[in-house]
């Protein structure tokens, strides 16, 4: 291999390194950027109030909802009146498996653009990312709220198609709620009680069939 080729390879490697570093630096700063105003306006108009989504509740990585279709779960989205890019997500009276108590979890989240890696997974226009950390938990209905350091919400929402998926990690007993990718159907809110009863019936049939 002649000297000229070696020199070109060296320059190519150096250039690739700095290009990678620049990309990483840009992605690291993405959380400081705001999503486009038009996209936020669309999100605030649709992703608001009570919304029923299908979730898998996991304990130590094991899906306790058992059914592939997940469990109907009611979330509340309330947008900030002082910060346009921010909202509060609330999950009330959540329980899983044989837990002897219910959990209410509340977390403030902020919208931001996707980084370069996320754009490869969530293709197309209209995607927003939202992150929130250190929410607070209330055990039982009359319990006092306590900050749960290390807990977080991380997810993605498309303002055009209304697709959404996110994870709620409570940082407690390795419990997570995983909202897998799905399209929001607002009509589910009024049918929540009936849908939940059907889930319980299907779950009982599943347990009987599998000897659980």
Give the positions of each predicted feature.
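Bacterial N-terminal signal peptides that target proteins for export
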Residues: 2-13
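Acidic/polar, low-complexity intrinsically disordered N-terminal segments immediately downstream
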Residues: 4, 26-118, 122-127, 173-212
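Short, flexible coil/linker elements and helix-boundary hinge sites characteristic
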Residues: 9, 143, 162, 210-211
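C-terminal motif of bacterial Sec signal peptides marking the signal peptidase cleavage site
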Residues: 20-23
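Beta-strand residues in well-ordered beta-sheet regions across diverse protein folds
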Residues: 90-92, 131, 167
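Acidic, glycine-rich flexible loop segments
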Residues: 127-165
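Ser/Thr/Pro-rich, low-complexity mucin-like regions
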Residues: 161-178
């Amino acid at each position: 291999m002649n000297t000229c080729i070696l020199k070109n390879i060296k320059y190519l490697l150096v250039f690739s390194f700095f290009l990678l570093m620049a990309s990483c630096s840009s992605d690291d700063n993405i959380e400081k950027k705001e999503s486009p105003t038009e996209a936020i306006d669309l999100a605030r108009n649709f992703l608001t109030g009570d919304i029923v989504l299908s979730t898998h509740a996991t304990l130590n990585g094991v899906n306790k909802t058992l059914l592939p279709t997940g469990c109907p779960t009611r979330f509340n989205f309330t947008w900030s009146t002082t910060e346009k890019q921010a909202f509060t997500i609330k999950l009330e009276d959540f329980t899983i498996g044989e837990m002897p108590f219910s959990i209410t979890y509340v977390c403030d989240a902020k919208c931001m653009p996707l980084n370069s890696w996320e754009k490869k997974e969530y293709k197309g226009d209209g995607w927003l990312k939202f992150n929130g950390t250190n929410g607070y938990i209330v055990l039982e209905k009359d319990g006092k709220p306590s900050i749960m350091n290390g807990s977080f919400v991380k997810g993605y929402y498309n303002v055009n198609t209304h697709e959404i998926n996110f994870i709620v990690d409570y940082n407690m007993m390795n419990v997570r709620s995983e909202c897998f990718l799905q399209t929001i159907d607002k009509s589910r809110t009024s049918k929540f009680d009936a849908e939940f009863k059907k889930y319980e019936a299907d779950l009982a049939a599943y347990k009987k069939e599998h000897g659980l």
